[in-house]
Amino acid sequence: MKEQKLIHEGLITESLPNGMFRVRLDNEDLILGYISGRIRRSFIRILPGDRVKIEMSRYDSTRGRIIYRLRKKDSND
């Protein structure tokens, strides 16, 4: 049986090496996010200040996989 993933929205605050980012979630948690393979293959640029959807395991709440970059009009701001 596949593990259920939690999906949150957040804001990229810092860019780190090797496709890693510091992400501030909407619930004010600060986690480490890495780019999913689909985003990496599509050459989607993610910069500090972008809003993203991030998928987290329920077992490790300090890391997550960035699965979608929200457009400016898609975000809730």
UniProtKB/Swiss-Prot annotation:
Compartment(s): Plastid, Chloroplast
GO CC annotations, alphabetized: chloroplast; cytosol
Keywords attached to this entry: Chloroplast, Initiation factor, Plastid, Protein biosynthesis, RNA-binding, rRNA-binding
SUPFAM superfamilies hit by this protein: Nucleic acid-binding proteins (SSF50249)
Pfam family, any one: eIF-1a
The keyword Signal is assigned to this record: no
Keyword Iron among UniProt keywords: no
Protein family according to the UniProt entry: Belongs to the IF-1 family.
Subunit structure: Component of the 30S ribosomal translation pre-initiation complex which assembles on the 30S ribosome in the order IF-2 and IF-3, IF-1 and N-formylmethionyl-tRNA(fMet); mRNA recruitment can occur at any time during PIC assembly.
Designated name of the protein: Translation initiation factor IF-1, chloroplastic
UniProt organism field: Phalaenopsis aphrodite subsp. formosana
Top-level taxonomy: Eukaryota, Viridiplantae, Streptophyta, Embryophyta, Tracheophyta
Encoding gene per record: infA
